[in-house]
């Protein structure tokens, strides 16, 4: 598995807290499209199809 970048880990951490894309964008001072791209990359690196699956897989792998 390709490692997550620091920013991807930040986004994943916020996803695990239940934050929406707009909340993540606001907190990290990013555009919503950039957040969506990070979520897409996270899912690809974890080999999953959804943000919920990404959270479950990240927890099972103790990524955060």
What are the roles of these predicted feature ranges?
Residues 1-40, 60-63:
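Helix-turn-helix DNA-binding segment
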Residues 44-64:
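Basic, Lys/Arg-enriched C-terminal extension of HTH/homeodomain DNA-binding domains
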